């Protein structure tokens, strides 16, 4: 970003700078100059006015926070540590572009003939992708509100995401495989009235001359008649022009691009909630726009990169694969072999598709490293960057990784939360950019989560809790003001998200995770509140009390549940009954891997269910049992009736 000089707003002959805080994010009115040209910014500025809150690297932004964050957090130093002196933020797009769709549109113009998406050998160019997204935006109309999109690993989902954003709507991915009642509850919770249709099958998706992306709706999303909630107005995806195709997409008419308030919601995603209902997180456009700009630099993306789309499209990790790629002129690769469950097939696909960037859940990476070690193999030569995140990395696997022929590959550990928009902290653990270690990784080492990215403000609060601020903080939880107030706080006139994670800071500024302040867990890299699972299980008529906690089984983080049967319930089949009951109500990651029927739970001195104590008492012994080795016996305390959820 070019150097910018700060000028002050003249008020009655006096020069001054006006800075105010709005309810969400930072607003300001100031006058600054860019290469001698004066520019104005104000709380009502649109993206083409270069609103300061879209440019957290701007000197005025940093000036606003002088003295308001601890001295140990230095945004300018963090920037140099990641990118090196002299590197700019928007490498592949105009630095003046701030909105995500503006960045995508500019990328389409620069790389129109290059492949944007590759799916099972079929190629969708940037020009075609831009035309489809633009046509969908026209169908949706201006500001369509929350739009539900079936989240499946196909190009349609990407077109849906970009089209909804281009229309000024809020993208809401919904897994077609989750139970209909939960799906309906999610759509009702966010007031969704519009859904996208999807293609009927591979033959409809591709025609003789290339991709068509046809799409009449099949089955109304599988929503069951009689369920409470809004009826969806359904919008079909457009087709590309081609032989025998109806409704062809033409070149979009030239004109002034639609300007959208950066505080408008960009997407809604659901996180686990202690009440038994998921919490919809509302992320504004300014948050995803500034984050994607940082991630392009963090990953060092160029048009020559080929990025695998691996993550579930129901979770925000997929955005860090899709959006930086499609605003850098790189190629996004979707391939079913990525989810085949076979490491040999996965590796053959990576080699065949010439993948350069892998973004993997840490749990998957751990297993992949074991496979590579046992087979004495390494990743294909095309891979230059592996991004991991979602849970703590295993130091033993890091030692194995270092012993492989991986010195040329960046291994980037990342940290973030849905409420702070994708990645907020990162560190190179191995490879050409990693700091040299004094000794190899060993069991018991704590793996750091890294430094804050340039757009992120951080603060270590009471009990060493990590607070994250800056323009990437979400608006809050839709329709849940109390939950929003509990997790989003104003400290020293800055709005922060309370992560609930305890951290420590090393002398070099790198943070290390030290545990949770609450009972939240990570399962398959997804945040889970055990209380949500407990609330669901407590609804089973045969259960009188329940405790849910995390355990490690076969090297994987899983949920385990301990249930106390009601009098008269069939204890011998209760575990299977509860499992079937849950599968009809919640996503698969909320179904415990092991459900154990027990006569009683362990309680604390205050009478609350002790999850850890119950697990310590009732977990089976032996390797792979999930029981903590050497755990002291827990004294028996009779269970009290009807303990549906304690936290």
List PLM regions with ranges:
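AMP-binding/adenylate-forming domain of the ANL superfamily
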Residues: 79-268, 283-284, 290, 398, ...
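Core catalytic subdomain of AMP-forming adenylate-forming
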Residues: 125-126, 152, 191, 417-418, ...
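Conserved S/T- and glycine-rich ATP-binding loop of Class I adenylate-forming
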Residues: 147, 164, 195, 265, ...
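Conserved AMP-binding
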Residues: 151-156, 175, 301, 311-318, ...
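Short hydrophobic alpha-helices that are characteristic scaffold elements of the AMP-binding
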Residues: 162-167, 189, 315, 326-328, ...
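Adenylate-forming
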Residues: 200-213, 217-224, 232, 296-298, ...
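Conserved pre-ATP/AMP-binding loop-to-beta segment of ANL
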Residues: 252-270, 277, 301-307, 313, ...
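Conserved AMP-binding/adenylation subdomain of ANL enzymes
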Residues: 279-306, 316-356
